Amino acid sequence: MNARLDATRVASILARVAQARPRVHCLTNTVAQNVTANMLLAFGAIPSMAVHPDEVADVAAAAGAILINLGTISPEGERAIPRLLELARAQGKPLVLDPVFVELSPLRMRLAEDILRLPGIVVRGNGGEMQALAPLLAATPGATRITTGAVDRIEAPSGLFEIAHGHPLMTKVTGLGCASSALVAACCAVEPDPGLAAGAALTAFGIAGEIAAERSAGPGSFAMHLIDALASLDEATLLTRMG
Ligand SMILES: Nc1ncnc2c1ncn2[C@@H]1O[C@H](COP(=O)(O)OP(=O)(O)OP(=O)(O)O)[C@@H](O)[C@H]1O
Ligand SMILES: Cc1ncsc1CCO
Ligand SMILES: [Mg+2]
């Protein structure tokens, strides 16, 4: 099922991130901002986090990809969203939606519905979030749907990928799902097939999680080791871990 996503392919996408150093503009939640920025840097990408509706499109204009995360959506963030959608549409820029807790509020569901109208949209959520969005996604042809958990499932126009890497400690540090969405966006900036881009990002993140778990004593040191493991991931490690 993942025949097109071997270690060489993943390494090639990661090398393109390291070479191009794409900026990912993150309209994200206040909890996950720091860990998201640090994971992007460890991955070789560059974060920008502007929120103000009157500057967000200027700041994002030269970014390689955009992330919209609904986790602590504010009135200001809500006004920034159409600016980013307009920019992504005009420039054909990749946009990833992280529908945090979309099942908890009609406001989030309405915002998700607007964002899902963007052609080529990529959505990454956990099982509950993706289940809540299922009726909307069923009416969204061309979207890439990513459900993370013990096994990550990527349903893309180019096919289905399943990633069985990672570690349960990844659920004990807040914002790692949010950070994974940003890494998917970074790969979308350098790889036109969003299925392969998401597969590379989540394989790298999962393998870094496995390595970090071997080095850590609990969730605190795990977060630190995860940044280090992601920053030093190389093709030889991918080959060994992907088998
Ligand atoms: N039980 C598990 N075993 C291995 N890896 C896991 C497990 N659960 C989650 N992961 C990994 O953790 C990362 C985050 O996924 P998760 O589904 O926990 O996100 P999330 O619920 O959106 O997190 P958050 O909202 O806290 O940011 C993914 O890379 C995923 O593969
Ligand atoms: C804990 C939390 N609350 C809103 S966003 C967030 C980070 C994980 O999604
Ligand atoms: Mg989440």
Can you say where each PLM-predicted feature lies in the sequence?
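Conserved N-terminal subdomain of the carbohydrate kinase-like
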Residues: 2-97
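Short, well-ordered alpha-helix to beta-strand connector turns
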Residues: 21, 63-64, 119-120, 142-143
